[in-house]
Curated annotation (Swiss-Prot):
Co-factor binding comment: Binds 1 Ca(2+) ion per subunit. Binds 2 Zn(2+) ions per subunit.
EC number from the UniProt entry: 3.4.24.-
Tissues in which the protein is found: Specifically expressed in stromal cells of breast carcinomas.
UniProt repeat feature Hemopexin, residue ranges: 291-339, 340-382, 384-432, 433-480
Name recorded for this polypeptide: Stromelysin-3
Name of the gene: MMP11
Motif residue range(s): Cysteine switch: 78-85
Cofactor: Ca(2+); Zn(2+)
Origin species: Homo sapiens
InterPro entries documented for this protein: Hemopexin-like_dom (IPR000585), Hemopexin-like_dom_sf (IPR036375), Hemopexin-like_repeat (IPR018487), Hemopexin_CS (IPR018486), M10A_MMP (IPR033739), MetalloPept_cat_dom_sf (IPR024079), Pept_M10_metallopeptidase (IPR001818), Pept_M10A (IPR021190)
Residues noted as binding Ca(2+) in the record, renumbered to the chain: 171-172, 174, 176
Enzyme class: hydrolase
Chief location: secreted
Amino acid sequence: MAPAAWLRSAAARALLPPMLLLLLQPPPLLARALPPDAHHLHAERRGPQPWHAALPSSPAPAPATQEAPRPASSLRPPRCGVPDPSDGLSARNRQKRFVLSGGRWEKTDLTYRILRFPWQLVQEQVRQTMAEALKVWSDVTPLTFTEVHEGRADIMIDFARYWHGDDLPFDGPGGILAHAFFPKTHREGDVHFDYDETWTIGDDQGTDLLQVAAHEFGHVLGLQHTTAAKALMSAFYTFRYPLSLSPDDCRGVQHLYGQPWPTVTSRTPALGPQAGIDTNEIAPLEPDAPPDACEASFDAVSTIRGELFFFKAGFVWRLRGGQLQPGYPALASRHWQGLPSPVDAAFEDAQGHIWFFQGAQYWVYDGEKPVLGPAPLTELGLVRFPVHAALVWGPEKNKIYFFRGRDYWRFHPSTRRVDSPVPRRATDWRGVPSEIDAAFQDADGYAYFLRGRLYWKFDPVKVKALEGFPRLVGPDFFGCAEPANTFL
């Protein structure tokens, strides 16, 4: 076996320490001397290269030549190693300038892990720099980034040399500085930096790690290279200080993930009674007993984290696999502190945020953590309220509808706006009555509409309510006895 091939073998990885392997990697001259199709054969065994999934019409990399290499910096200016979008893709995105890869993360809370570090910088400097590079993106979106130190993270960061296992070899100092992999590809979230660069922080006498890292994280989030002036997502490296996003960068990432949530405002709590001071406070009353699910007309219903939640008068019923969970019904404030009572409607969006509506206001939670609210419904483009029901529709949770009386609106969480303040007629939903109280979608794609103690099941294929409905909510969802009188 040739020495270069042995260095990339499993035996070498087992016998030699990782840092020694880095030092023994073949230099650019040996890499160029490999057979022209060697890395293409490897790519065929593993499938298409990761960026091909996002850019079907990207040109194939030029085959290696036998020409003795010159220093990379004399061949071309330093740049990102992610291939530029094809002409066709650029033309389709020319009006909006920023270019998308075709993928995005379907969540907003992401983790990252640093596997290896550059030799020029201490580890704590690198950690702070990576956090700062991610912060330029989280400042303009709802995204959050948390470092982890073991296991698989969403974003895996590494410093490597030459051939390093992804068919996109580095070329030594200068030239290609780093590359990253888009969402929805087989190596999504991987970010690789060339170990042989002279990495610095805030210094133009080398390669600024902060700027390069922020650029690569843009790829990880789904952005391609752009030709917009002074954009961070430009393919070519130019030292700029301080680091900032251009308007084009902001528009691109907000097109994918939306704008950041407004800061939650909290009222300063009044001081409690102090010792030795008489007060006229009345002790808080114990909450009323929960309503009977067999007789209740529910305020809202929503599928949250794959489970079904029924809301009524400040209480919540939690069903998993069709079974009411122990400890329920319980106060809804047990899960969502500060949630008003009662709620008019609720839904979970594709990013896992849970929206609640009451009157002319709405609230948003990330799990059980409040991130927004109360906020006016007019921010969403609604001029009529309250919202009586909210329905998440479609396999990707990308269609959300608000219902009120005989009207409905389509809502986009990414922009936080309805299509139009002018509603459509609810008669579009054939066989479903007007004035519904709640709505939700099950795992099979069927929609359910509740009014009073009855519900209608809606077929997504025939686009109409199924025969045999309405039926009673109590017996079908809570195992209640069927009433003797069938005339409801």
